[in-house]
Amino acid sequence: MFKKILIANRGEIACRVIKSARKMGIRTVAVYSDADRNALHVRMADEAVHIGPPPAAQSYIVIDKIMDAIRQTGAEAVHPGYGFLSENMKFAEALEKEGVVFIGPPSPAIEAMGDKITSKKLAQEAGVSTVPGYMGLIADADEAVKISNEIGYPVMIKASAGGGGKGMRIAWSDEEARDGFQSSKNEAAASFGDDRIFIEKFVTQPRHIEIQVLADKHGHCVYLHERECSIQRRNQKVIEEAPSPFLDAATRKAMGEQACALARAVGYTSAGTVEFIVDGNRNFYFLEMNTRLQVEHPVTELITGVDLVEQMIRVAAGEALPFAQGDLKINGWAMESRLYAEDPYRNFLPSIGRLTRYRPPVEAATATGVVRNDTGVYEGGEISMYYDPMIAKLCTWAPTRAEAIEGMRVALDTFEVEGIGHNLPFLSAVMDHPRFVEGAITTAFIAEEYPEGFQGVTLPMGQLRKVAAAAAAMNRVAEIRRARISGTLGNHERHVGDDWVVGLQGEEIVVKIAADRDGATVHFDDGTSHRVTSDWAPGQPLARLDVDGEPVVLKVGKIPSGFRIRTRGADLKVHVRTPRQAELARLMPEKQPPDTSKYLLCPMPGLVVKISVEEGQEVQEGQALATIEAMKMENILRAEKKGVVKKIAASAGASLKVDDVIMEFE
């Protein structure tokens, strides 16, 4: 077994590999850029080597710099994680020449499967079901439009060397095919150093289901069942689960056997994932094979009990798999939610900055439930504009799907993140969505259920009244504390009344509080009531309450005359006032936001790739105005209405902050 391995990656996956290596008694070496000097993976590793400036193109994907770090530390093997150099054949070959073991598949398999055009041809030869499409190289946007018309819209435009949702576009028209081709080509060149593009038919209403395979160097190959990855936004997975709520045993077996057949056909060893799209009749088609560890591998580990990172290391060291196909049973259900530094209220635009608060739920493992959090950040650390915006992968396991979902709801409610925009509210909303709970999902779920983007969650009246009761009870605790603070008028003790008006979500709810030693009963003016008990104290950001015998978790922040309360995806300003205060508050004018309709503002921190118009030019609704690159993704900003460009304030190559002016209209 290896004594020392180097992890050619960063963030949560580097931390994840370090954990398994540490368990196996193997020393670890981290690499880091200037931006990651104080990163968690650097702190966790036994050794760390600096490899360059923040941009990945100058550090994490420079093969020579990784090779220098290997020579400097004497590492015997390298785990590439995912992304960066994980599917780079030249890197695997460089390691082989150096006599260093690559913890992954052999370079011919990487070459064959890393190229989506070649892999599709090989899949067909191996008897794997495939989607119709054009597998040749496409020279320019005109040819892309021509081929798209021959295949028939909609089509999927994809980078041959792509992955992770980068370099992928769905086109429904000639215009979208033309724009999508150029954006995919640019993203592919920036992310993978390979701008080749191919086009295939887009299967409407598909599910994205993938099979985890594991093969050793002794001829053994097994599949560790499937992962359902259909909850996606812009082809980037958001929520995954294992097993799939859609597959039956026969389809699962057929998909697993085809995945192993493909792995054997290319001489594959190590962990790999064969991705399929599955239609409503359970017909499945090969999508691609990822010759690396997947982001979502924890859900497979949770339902099989197999440490995939450990097995990758053991296979690389020449050991045989310790189990056969018949040993790999599905045990329970696992969910994974990807916590991203992106603002769901601003169309999921990337967010950067310092994590002023980062308190994940307590990790635990019992026979009835597991909470696991894979992360690469810590409180006080920074989220950089240079890398993927993922903060953490929150996973839950339980005996049933319903229990795993409920475990995830609670875990999300107790996850505290402040300082940056994040998608926790959106993840909570999906977990509560009836269609998700039912399992009736496709890759179009987010686009169909949130066509205007995420606008927040409106709580049903039953939940709203529980929040109102909790807020009233917490407000009473805060008021009593304020009444007892020293420095008030002598011989005067401020009275805390029982009658309050709770304002939230556009509603005013009149309540009367009857408090006792154990808690408070909050009475509503319609004769109903809620019993609230809690040990919450003013200033605590997380309130764990019991409302009518049921646990309720609220994230709590102080605002004038009340609280900011976040729960189950809802973000509420809850005002708790005396009846007189409520009467006066109704008379107060509301402050109007400034009018920015004549400006194109930068929606995220990023780099201006292109300004598509000129001063004095008339633009039409939907016309491309500028392209901003952030978190390795290109974002095209379009005109919201017809107008004339008065002034352009930014230029290509400029680095902008949120709300910086890009251009002004007449």
Question: Model-derived features: where do they sit?
Answer:
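Structured, non-catalytic alpha/beta "coupling" segments that mediate domain-domain communication
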Residues: 77, 87-94, 336, 346, ...
